[in-house]
Amino acid sequence: IGTCLVGSEMCIRDSYNRVFQAKPQLGSNFKPFLYSAAFENGYNPSSIILDAPIVFEDDNLEDVWRPKNSSGRFYGPTRLREALVQSRNIVSVRLLQELGIDKVRSHVQKYGFQEDEIPNDLSLALGSYSSTPLQNAKAFSIIANGGKSIEPYYIEKIVLPNSEVLDFSKTKTLDLRASRLWNGYNLSLIHI
């Protein structure tokens, strides 16, 4: 009790398990599930959606909503293949609008997303749904396994034939110079 599959060193002390308890928004990680709904409903990777400015006015919003691509640019007619690879927000919002929110909400439940937690608005296209990392990994495993859902399970320990128990808790610290070098490379990659 109090151990974690993924987390910080504080995990054991405060017993907050990020795998089971954290529920960050999926963001662009949600887009493959949206596109899956599109492909199931007659769209294909070559289908074209307009990537152009769009404005939504809604009394429930404090202001108008103008979704944008992360680049701040618009790309005109865009194939779904390119839109998914480039994570184009406008295409995703328009696609959700064309498909209908109810249809997409129904479809993504096949991946284990909980109906009562799925947003009922166009922000869903941008991943406003919150999910635990375990739920997210399970959903993606369905895609990776060709549509087969496999229930994740926890391996507590592995005992070798000589009765030796593998210790997964042993960590190795790399040479500090190598660590600093890699951190520099990682920072440069962030800015690409």
Language model: regions and residue ranges:
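Single conserved hydrophobic/aromatic residue that forms the stacking wall/gate
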Residues: I1-G7, I12, I190-H191
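Short, charged, amphipathic alpha-helices and their helix-cap/turn boundaries
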Residues: L99-D116
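Glycine- and acidic
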Residues: R13-Q21, N89-I90, P119-L124
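Active-site beta-strand/loop architecture of penicillin-binding DD-peptidases
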Residues: S8-E9, R13-P24, S36-A37, I143-A144, ...
